[in-house]
């Protein structure tokens, strides 16, 4: 089994879509093995997205991710990273495939409901940013 990290972003929480998005995730065969509701500070959001520090959208991303509560989750499934990225759709909801999370719920490229790790290696690092080992449910 492979794991990936997702974050239901502040726009998802504000629009009261947590349940709808988790339902879509579980219906796609993912198992939630860790989940919490938290609020990132500008500092922690900046640390999490440090890889984008030199990109023009970095400041807006940090501001947005620290603007309200978010829900990080570790998901488990065979081929989790690729399958999850397919489920959520393109970063820009206008370019996302029909039926994807972002096509259904996102308003813009900047406020796009959900983060998904882009590789198994990054998923492991990102999961460790939010969760201690004892917070993760063991696989059966």
UniProtKB/Swiss-Prot annotation:
Single Gene Ontology MF annotation: ATP binding
EC number(s) given by UniProt: 2.7.4.6
Keyword Transferase: yes
Reaction(s) catalysed by this chain's protein: a 2'-deoxyribonucleoside 5'-diphosphate + ATP = a 2'-deoxyribonucleoside 5'-triphosphate + ADP; a ribonucleoside 5'-diphosphate + ATP = a ribonucleoside 5'-triphosphate + ADP
Protein origin, superkingdom: Bacteria
Keywords: ATP-binding, Cytoplasm, Kinase, Magnesium, Metal-binding, Nucleotide metabolism, Nucleotide-binding, Phosphoprotein, Transferase
GO cellular component, one term: cytoplasm
Localization: Cytoplasm
GO biological process terms, semicolon-separated: CTP biosynthetic process; GTP biosynthetic process; UTP biosynthetic process
Cofactor dependence: Mg(2+)
Keyword Magnesium: yes
Binding site for ATP: 9, 57, 85, 91, 102, 112
List of catalytic residues: 115
Primary localisation category: cytoplasm
PANTHER family: NUCLEOSIDE DIPHOSPHATE KINASE, NUCLEOSIDE DIPHOSPHATE KINASE DDB_G0292928-RELATED
Subunit structure: Homotetramer.
Entry's family note: Belongs to the NDK family.
Stated role: Major role in the synthesis of nucleoside triphosphates other than ATP. The ATP gamma phosphate is transferred to the NDP beta phosphate via a ping-pong mechanism, using a phosphorylated active-site intermediate.
Protein's UniProt name: Nucleoside diphosphate kinase
Organism name: Chlorobium luteolum (strain DSM 273 / BCRC 81028 / 2530)
